[in-house]
């Protein structure tokens, strides 16, 4: 957890100014005890900004440019996913139509088979009747 800490005493402030050689600073610095990084919050004059010491900075923050690049790449990735899903949806729709056509064709074939079976049954019945008549004729 970050905590705001003022310079503890004047000596600490002067040590900071000595490190920068020139400049003044008025404000707070924020210490992150997890990774010992320091962030400044306050007013710096121009010389202090130019000569400030190298201090490890918390890397959790990103610049606007980095964020926009990430957002753009993420948007592009989402667009690719959307187009892929749209193409797959179209394929599924086409396959559904093909399945419906096959079902209609299957129904027509089953009706044709029923008609063929009925015709064969009628022919079988006729043959049976003819056999009975032939038997009667032969028996006379």
Curated annotation (Swiss-Prot):
- Indicate what this protein is called per its UniProt record: UPF0134 protein MPN_130
Family that this chain belongs to: Belongs to the UPF0134 family.
Query: Which domain of life does this protein belong to?
Result: Bacteria
């Amino acid at each position: 957890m970050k905590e705001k800490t003022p310079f503890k005493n004047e000596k600490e402030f002067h040590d900071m100014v000595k490190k920068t050689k020139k400049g003044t600073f008025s404000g707070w610095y924020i210490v992150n005890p997890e990774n010992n990084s320091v962030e400044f919050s306050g007013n710096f004059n121009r010389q202090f900004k130019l000569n400030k010491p190298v201090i490890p900075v918390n890397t959790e923050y990103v610049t606007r440019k980095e964020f926009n690049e990430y957002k753009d790449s993420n948007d592009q990735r989402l667009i690719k996913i959307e187009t892929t899903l749209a193409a797959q949806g179209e394929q599924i729709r086409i396959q559904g139509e093909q399945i419906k056509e096959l079902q209609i064709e299957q129904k027509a074939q089953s009706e044709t088979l029923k008609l063929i079976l009925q015709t064969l049954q009628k022919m079988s019945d006729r043959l049976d009747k003819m056999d009975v008549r032939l038997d009667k004729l032969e028996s006379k």
